[in-house]
Amino acid sequence: MTHTSSSNPRLDESRTIIAPTGTALTAKSWLTEAPLRMLMNNLHPDVAEHPHALVVYGGIGRAARNWQCYDKIVEVLTRLEDDETLLVQSGKPVGVFKTHTNAPRVLIANSNIVPHWANWEHFNELDKQGLMMYGQMTAGSWIYIGSQGIVQGTYETFVAMARQHFDGKAAGRWVLTGGLGGMGGAQPLAATMAGFSMLAVECDESRIDYRLRTGYVDRKATTLDEALAIIEESKQSGTPVSVGLLGNAADVYADIVQRGIVPDITTDQTSAHDPLNGYLPQGWSMEQAAEMRLKDEPAVVIAAKKSMAIQVQAMLDLQKSGSATVDYGNNIRQMALEEGVANAFDFPGFVPAYIRPLFCEGIGPFRWAALSGDPEDIYKTDQKVKELIPDNPHLHNWLDMARERIQFQGLPARICWVGLKDRARLGKAFNEMVKNGELKAPIVIGRDHLDSGSVASPNRETEGMMDGSDAVSDWPLLNALLNTASGATWVSLHHGGGVGMGFSQHSGMVIVCDGTDDAAERVGRVLHNDPATGVMRHADAGYDIAINCAKEQNLDLPMLSEPK
């Protein structure tokens, strides 16, 4: 049954989706209840950016293709048996097949297009015809947990930047950025947690207001003078503050250059990966952009990319003036390059500059959510992480700050960057906590697709690989296949997340800890094998940290000792 209230099958203003909580099952087991709740959680009004349109985050990253498909997915998950697998093709449930109890209950493929046709123009045509949807990374794979999902990764990046550029001292320094959407909205909180102040430019006032309500932004400004005065005050006091400035990023960045002001760090997290839907051209209102998207898509794209070129040129100018400038993975450099900014890639991406050593040890954005809906279940797992990893004060500090400063969105959840050495141990411990009743209901464990072995993205995660293998996308395919073989509860394989059509392929997995012995076996396999593929991928590329980690963890990599 469908409830759509307009001629657009993707829009239904009457819908409010909130996942069930507690121990009563809607589906036949926790293995199907879990994907059902996490799908619904992606569309919770406190989680999704535009839930009535099925948009979770990242421009047009959706949880389901349309409301009819959403309803059918829910219906199938409630009747799915524990030896059946649902196949989802770009947000549409297309088949249920008999498999076995250790197979995934759901297999998802989103936004995948044969490479020659893998561009926004062809995707948008398919999208209009109702043949495809954009899954982003965790939108269409049902494991988005709100802005917390990227806070720690952003925090780790800012900490690394403080260490690399400022001798570890962030006090009195500030960051210029753009974008306060589902991903970018994590930046202000991550910056202040790391000791920096931040000026974040956002063209949608409702996003600034939402980040204020949820504690991600401290102050709001409507003029650059007002925002800079707040930043100057924080520099003098040494107390970090974040400011959301209502404005256009291209305008503001160029104005800052014109004034001769140099931020300590410059970056950007606008949705530049999608010039049609994600970036507001200079001089345009939000209403004008929405209208033009319906009337003249090419004109919107042209205007957006011209504005991106102006913003990137300003970032290059700030870099020359001494600002530590970094691309935060939205492909804005590529867009500017296509508009004639020949040296757009003169500033690095954040992964090769600051994150890759972590990836070499399989360390990445491990996350879990409490299906009970009770925050106490998360606090208990926080404590378990501290018990099992007692000698990592940086991690303990993160968990303490997260509890104090991060508001849960939808189901209570936690993000925690750990790697190959720890993920399986933690997962099995969580499963045991469910088994013995310490936790009120099962836990789901997943991750971002932005992880060490699950993505090929030459302008982001795999930029500048030392062996030149940036564009080799066999690795995320192998990761998805191995997670399927290992018994993950649901596995996803996507294209275009983060950086847009034609620029990335990536995979995700989620595993349910339901307290059973079978779950313990599956958790052990999946949470070892998944990060191990990241160590394998980086060892194969020749990174010493990864090679040493592979040897320490006794990974069987047949070509490791052979010359390249």
UniProtKB/Swiss-Prot annotation:
The keyword Kinase does not apply. It holds the Pfam family Urocanase_N. The keyword NAD applies. Belongs to the urocanase family. Its cofactor is NAD(+). Its EC number is 4.2.1.49. Binds 1 NAD(+) per subunit. Pathway: Amino-acid degradation; L-histidine degradation into L-glutamate; N-formimidoyl-L-glutamate from L-histidine: step 2/3. It comes from Aliivibrio salmonicida (strain LFI1238). NAD(+) binds at residues 58-59, 136, 182-184, 202, 207, 248-249, 269-273, 279-280, 328, 498. It is an enzyme of class 4 (lyase). It is found in: Cytoplasm. The active site is at C416. It comes from the Bacteria. It catalyses: 4-imidazolone-5-propanoate = trans-urocanate + H2O. Keywords: Cytoplasm, Histidine metabolism, Lyase, NAD. Coiled coil: none annotated. Catalyzes the conversion of urocanate to 4-imidazolone-5-propionate. This is Urocanate hydratase. The lineage of its organism: Bacteria, Pseudomonadati, Pseudomonadota, Gammaproteobacteria, Vibrionales. One of its GO terms (molecular function) is urocanate hydratase activity.
